[in-house]
Amino acid sequence: MNRSEASTHLDKVLANVDANIDASLARLFDLIRIPSVSTDPAHAPDCKRAAEWLKKELGELGFDASVRPTARHPMVVGHDRTGQGPHVLFYGHYDVQPVDPRGLWHSDPFEPKLVPQPDGETHIVARGASDDKGQLLTFVEACRAWKAVAGSLPIQVSVLFEGEEEISSPSLPPFLDTTGAELKADVVLVCDTDMWDAETPAVTTMLRGVLKEEIVISCSNRDLHSGIYGNAARNPLQVLSDIVASLRTPDGGVAVQGFYDGVTELPDAIKAQWQRLPFDDKGFLGDIGLSIPAGESGRSVLEQVWARPSCEIHGIIGGYTEEGFKTVIPAKAQSKISFRLVAGQDPEKIRDAFRAHVRAHIPADCSVEFIDHGASAATVMPIDGAFLTKALGALTEEWEREAAVAGSGGSIPIVSAFKEKLGMDSLLIGFARFDNRIHSPNEKYDLSSFRKGIRSWARILAAFAHDKG
């Protein structure tokens, strides 16, 4: 199906989505009712049941679908290669977070409720409504509408649904190693992110990477009495404090030598679009009781959190911290430190540079141990890519607002895995809202997000169709 043919079907496809929204919602409710909590071994049968449910739905749509075992929870793989033109891989996850604390839920977490709101919106309240079952099904239901109207999809589609995203996807990298050739596509589509706001869709094209390190400073061979050894003995807490203080520059940058090697400036076009976004720097910080940005001076808050690397201290441990007072010089002190990375930074080179920086600050009679807590590289989608351009256009048509090109200060290891192992870029297109309470009691997904999410994917599939028949 070429783009002209897809365009002739699109209005009927969108009408089909609207006419069948109740049936789509019923299917979502069926999936939500399966308590596929991946972290709890007691729910392993439920994870398998959710995978089988998805396989069945895909099979009914004409996908060649199968459930693939892993060391823990199964993958669901489906292919519909009957279409022409580009080949996309859609990724989602069927596992959910635990519901604790159960007492804070207003209703059964696995019995979805439609809750009308004063503003006219309706919330779908249940665990997994937003993260990620509701989001995942927006794509499946868009495929269903295309099949019902046109008999086929406008493009070639593969899907990968996993059941371990909420536990950091331990089975995904080895699965990609063995199944990568089958899953290789022109682009990955991920529906597990937020819109910019309730009316403005967004495509996330950049994710920061992360490097997590723990350092342990050892000095004396036992804890010491400060009245006897103070001044004469090295205090590892002081050594650690000096190291931590040395990591940042006065203007908010990172002082590790070579840290910014390979880091490039944000394109002017992206800076200009971010400046047009309705974002309030003062409000962003005011919500958390702060008022002054702490990152590199001369850069906007969005640039600081989306497009610049950072260093954060997450914990300092050592000495006496219980009630009362104890005048001890501890034998050891430790800290947990992470670096958010951007495109152009190699996590292993940053690790080496950080460790060299720390070693340079270790005095005689003291030693340091490093504990590696993992790392992943940043990912960036080319801003002039055809898939991004077409997706932005389709989203803008559906929402009647210019779709935003967004970044994310966080890290999604699966996106790095798709890039590193299969060489595939990812477009992150989600319809959640910042107030959806994912991972918290009373998680919700807006009914309008579900409906317009389905319509958005229907438009994107049409937009991706090739130009000529």
What annotation goes with each model-predicted range?
Residues 85-161, 452:
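Active-site metal-coordination/substrate-binding segment of hydrolases
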Residues 205, 226-316, 345-367:
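Acidic-enriched catalytic cores of C-N bond-cleaving enzymes acting on peptides and small amides
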Residues 16, 27-30, 57-61, 145, ...:
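Generic non-transmembrane alpha-helical segments
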Residues 242, 318, 323, 327-353:
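C-terminal catalytic subdomain
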Residues 216-218, 240, 307, 325, ...:
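Zn-dependent metallopeptidase/amidohydrolase metal-coordination segment
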Residues 2-102, 332, 336, 349:
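N-terminal helical capping/dimerization or prosegment-like subdomains
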